[in-house]
Amino acid sequence: MEYSDKQIAAQEAVRYIKDGMVIGIGSGSTVNEFLYCLAARMRKERLQVVGIPASKKSERLATELGIPLTTFATYQNVDIAIDGTDEIDDQLYLVKGGGGSLVREKMIDLVAETFIVIASGKKKIKKLGSFPVPVEVVPFGWQATEQRLQQFGCQTNLRMVEEDIFVSDNQNYIIDCDFKEIDDAEALHRSLKQIVGVIETGIFINMVDKAIVADNGELSILEK
């Protein structure tokens, strides 16, 4: 059987899961592969774990696969977080949020003792910016917030689903900001966060402990 790069990265990530762990579950297609692999290992080894999902989509799939779920009300500490990414650079900085779950993903990834990113090789780039930076904003006055975002030299698009405005799991809007190329991701993130109305950006700085990247069947483990 020939596996996709997403499946190869997911299979490697499951090796880091130990019995009794609280797992932060990100979102996206690569994380879906991780959930399939995790469920298979749980059945085979009777592995006992619980997960905290970052999105309703991940929550639904985990439930379908029989993976027990919990919340921060029960566990405030996360042993390991597994998440995908839209872009990752040489510093292991990320642009995430194409699925619209960036706030919850960042909350989980920040509190995790270990944060592992899984990705296919096409997500590995030299400099962030080829993928628009998602910015989650308060719905009230979003037009004014968008105008202030544009002052940073980006092209902006309010995220839509067909004819309707996309609404995040937190009931907010997302403005996708196309910077083309980001020279200083850390400074940009700080500046965007200072805009009133901005809740969070999809730039993830100094958070990743390990990246598992599969490119044309070849596996690479990247660490700082």
UniProtKB/Swiss-Prot annotation:
Domain of life: Bacteria
Transmembrane segments: none
Pathway assigned in UniProt: Carbohydrate degradation; pentose phosphate pathway; D-ribose 5-phosphate from D-ribulose 5-phosphate (non-oxidative stage): step 1/1
E.C. designation(s): 5.3.1.6
Signal peptide: none
Keyword annotations of the record: Isomerase
Active site: E105
Keyword Isomerase tagged: yes
Any GO MF annotation of the entry: ribose-5-phosphate isomerase activity
GO cellular component annotations of the record: cytosol
Positions contributing to substrate binding: S27, G28, S29, T30, D83, G84, T85, D86, K96, G97, G98, G99, K123
Broad enzyme group: isomerase
Reactions that this protein is recorded to catalyse: aldehydo-D-ribose 5-phosphate = D-ribulose 5-phosphate
Record GO biological process: D-ribose metabolic process; pentose-phosphate shunt, non-oxidative branch
Any Pfam family hit: Rib_5-P_isom_A
Subunit structure: Homodimer.
Function: Catalyzes the reversible conversion of ribose-5-phosphate to ribulose 5-phosphate.
Similarity comment text for this entry: Belongs to the ribose 5-phosphate isomerase family.
Protein name per its UniProtKB record: Ribose-5-phosphate isomerase A 2
Gene coding for it: rpiA2
